[in-house]
Amino acid sequence: MNNLLSCKQTIKMKNKFNLSLIAVLMAGTSALTSCSKDNDDVEEPIVDVAVEAKLSDSFFDKVAYKGAMGTVDWTTGWTSFTPNANVYGATTETLGPGIITANRTLDASKVYLLSGFVYVASGVTLTIPAGTVIRGDQASKATLVVVRGGKLIAEGTATNPIVFTSNKAVGQRGNGDWGGIILLGKSTNNNPGGVGKIEGGIDAAQADHGGKDVADNSGILKYVRIEFPGIAYVQDNEINGLTLGSVGSGTTLDYIQVSNSGDDSFEWFGGTVNAKHLISINNVDDIFDFDNGFSGRLQFVIGQRSPVFADAAGQSNGIESDNSNTEFSSTPRTRPVISNMTIIGPSTPGSVVDVKHQNANLWRKGSKMVLANSIFIGAKWGIDIRDVETGAALTDGTSLIKNNIYQVADATKEVIVSNNSFATADLLRTYLTTNGNTFIAEAAAGALLTTPYTLIATPNFTLATGSAAATGATF
């Protein structure tokens, strides 16, 4: 099969047969692997249609339990649930503002001040060793941007994570103290022409994301904490904790915590990147936000909400997923495939919840989805399905919501529909219960996990003894 594909050919698949064929080609063609290079000036095989993600894919660990963890706590050692109390050294070297134009490795013995917008140029790799601390400057809205073709290698360990945090003193830190991290790749999106400009006020010349390489590699983020990011550059043009623009599946995202983001914790604008072991605490806006044709896979992800942090200018949801703001059926369609997610709050027993908190899940503007084996407890409202194209994907089977557990503070809004193929909330509820989703009371929710409601201290998201979520996951 060596002559089946040259490095300069582009595969453009139009139907299910070809999607299957491409999987064979990618697995069995030595020409594809032999010509894979990191440098932009070397031709690479480009695949511009992703094989549709499924729960049966090898990416997913086929665990028996629902929710983000069983009896083993994968947050131990590298996370922090009290970031405002963490003592970090004074900064010893300034990074930025400007463009990094040559490969660079930081020094873990130094504490860096990230100043202004720092861009990792195309063809350049920024390497951050385990244990490095980088503190973001608020006045300059410090933000690290990896442009298309650039790479960030930030690989900590379970006992020595990399930390991006505020430059303010202990006790003085708050949501949105600095910008965040932005990765821009060459994978697909549904913007006109397949190229978008990332939001957040970054230099327009550096803001492009998108292309045709679904396997594009923007680097590695592993055992990384991002604390107090998420600044509003201008209204409705914010920087999130971790922003991902058309990032490809060659990128590694694993063991990443975003704490106290002033906007979304994680937001995807197109792309095909997969991720495991993500955790968000105490953010203001949406926890997980999908847009513009994102079609990657997620497993073992956690979001814990505070009752008091919410988006004053809009609404705060656990999941918020849109296909496109202008053309709801534009392709590629937004279609995250998610298993083993846990979202807790904002409602905790006895709490008063900010009025801007809304849904556990908001699916709208033509978004598709596969959501399975997950736990949502303490949301103000439950599942909100909006718009004809969104509902139609559930009824025609191209979307799926199955085997999830929901506990909602307002029982009258467990299920919400508007302008879609489910004429009433009862019809959507029938779909959900038929597919193994359950709605439970607050007392039952409290028996699922060990100590999930703990705020400003270390919670325990493992399954409680005798938990109803210990079995029942299906892939």
Regions found by a protein language model. Give the residues of each.
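Bacterial signal peptide processing site
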Residues: S36-N39
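Extracellular beta-rich repeat passengers
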Residues: V42-K110, L114-A121, A139-G149, G156, ...
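Bacterial N-terminal signal peptides that target proteins for export
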Residues: L5-L21
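C-terminal motif of bacterial Sec signal peptides marking the signal peptidase cleavage site
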Residues: S30-S34
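Hydrophobic helical h-region of N-terminal Sec-dependent signal peptides
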Residues: L21-G28
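Primarily the HKD phosphodiesterase
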Residues: I134-R135
